[in-house]
């Protein structure tokens, strides 16, 4: 496909406008100058997405089906939707063409994973400054010893055009028909595990970027004898690590932000020979009904007062009044309002985001039918069964079309 060679040509274009790894304050300023976000009263950036982009869209999330990985993916699973290589090439071509036409292109070079032995280098290229800022919040700086990583020579490339839309006629018969539109979908979140390329096109929900990379790590790490987990993690004063597994909205971020325990991370981790390590550099917390008395750490991280060029928290789809204050109880836009912020905005964190092997594992289940007791202590066999079964619920707003809790069996709480 020679995508990377074409991208290098783009980076060298005569008209310029390529802004690669620019300082964080300059990136925040670009978000404001380009009207991608507004400055709130506290200094955080407020942004809003189209109604079709207030949550993840599993039906538009696609995996390239190639002979190399054919037998390694459960294609019978409802969320593993295949796309053929030709269609994916079309998506890449459209993304590159869109980026070529952009006056400014924002590029960040980061990694996924705090453990340097399996940190994944990822270059994100977007025509939106806010996407680049989101990657600074959520993806980690490149460590000095990145050469130790099993992925050091296998970097991932992510092309993101969140506000542009695909031509439905061009993709007729290739992508699904979206019943809301009455024609072929104009959105795709697609990934090629073999060529290590991802495309986010038409989804302005910031979570699409982070979840694409989480999916990539979910696929690649088991082949390195590393277990990827959808969980938060914290550590007690004696070094005891706890994992809290659960789907989006079940309380991982809230429960792991404990003033008496150091936070490793709130959503995505690996568990390998060295112990537990956070994938991310920040948090992407649900904000609906956030109470500063009950959740002071998260509230402070999002809404502490600072000069906006030094703030950089992203408040997504929350109701903001003309005076720049927020009403976090107003869910008219979506019950899935979010706040993205770096871990360093929290008071009690473990900076290296790595810990030993967990002593306690908690499964957080949103039980829509009330069939489970509030708390259960599981035997080892029961825990293994529960991990494999993953009974829980999808919660309102976390995915497009989910308006009330919906029971689901999500294997491994992924």
Across the structure, where does each feature detected by a protein language model lie?
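N-terminal accessory targeting/assembly segments
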Residues: 1-156
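Glycine-rich, often acidic-flanked micro-motifs
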Residues: 2, 6-41, 52, 222, ...
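Glycine- and acidic
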Residues: 77, 194-202, 241, 411-413
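Short alpha-helical segments and helix-capping/turn motifs at coil-helix boundaries
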Residues: 88-98, 142-143, 183-185, 338-350
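Short secondary-structure capping/junction motifs at helix and strand boundaries
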Residues: 102-109, 223-228, 263-264
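Short, acidic Gly/Pro/Ser/Thr-rich loop/turn segments
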Residues: 115, 207, 368-372
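Charged, amphipathic alpha-helical linker segments immediately N-terminal to NTP-binding catalytic cores
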Residues: 156-220
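Conserved glycine(s) of the Walker
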Residues: 250-252
